[in-house]
Amino acid sequence: DWDRAFEGVAWFHITGITPAISDKAATLTLMACQAAKRHGVTVSCDLNFRKKLWTSAKAQQVMRPLMQYVDVCIGNEEDAKLCLGFTPDADVEKGQTDAHGYYGIFKGMMQEFGFKYVVSTLRESKSASHNGWKALSYDGQQFYESKHYDILPIIDRVGGGDSFSGGLIHGLIAYDGDQARALESAVAASALKHTIPGDFNMVSREEVENLAGGDASGRVQR
């Protein structure tokens, strides 16, 4: 009973992994998103393409129709290309993280799907244990690029995407739609997760806020 499930709910988050599991899971994801919108619930989606679960063609067949129900779309350049068919004007294969390469794709996604926010993480892979990390968001009027983090050493990348989404959702709710503060919260939360083993981001709100509001020139420290 999706309508009952969404009574009193403010936010619903999905990822591209769930509909990739099976056709039934894809149908249920669509039904959930439709019910969420009927109840005025904000819907966010981390595209999160997984090539072991489905092909790009199948992903686009399923994910593109879902986007009409999504308010906040999260994904890197590969996700946008493989799930939605958008390609940035940036040489991402060489680790380029120039935010300007994403402006065109963000505008195109916003125009086609009517998102409230489009958000992407930008990773610069220097080595397996050393990454640069930042993010970019667009609200249809302004682009915002977060501060850059130098993460060394990386302890565990698992959970980095989920911690980013969680930080973004928290920020958009707590800071009343302030995309700059929300994005800084998301990037800081994810940067901290890279320094923690395991799936869960075992940090406090205070730690995230301190990092988000601190000096952007230093390395991530805990």
Residues of each region from the PLM?
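Ribokinase/PfkB-type carbohydrate-kinase core domain
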Residues: 1-144, 148-152, 177, 201-210, ...
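Short glycine/serine/threonine-biased micro-segments
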Residues: 14, 157-159, 196
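Active-site catalytic microenvironments for nucleophilic, acid-base chemistry
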Residues: 35, 171-175, 192
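Phosphate-handling active-site elements
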Residues: 142-145, 171-185
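Short, small-residue alpha-helix embedded
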Residues: 154-179
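Residues forming the Rossmann-fold NAD(P)(H) cofactor-binding site
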Residues: 166, 184, 188
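Short arginine-rich
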Residues: 190-201
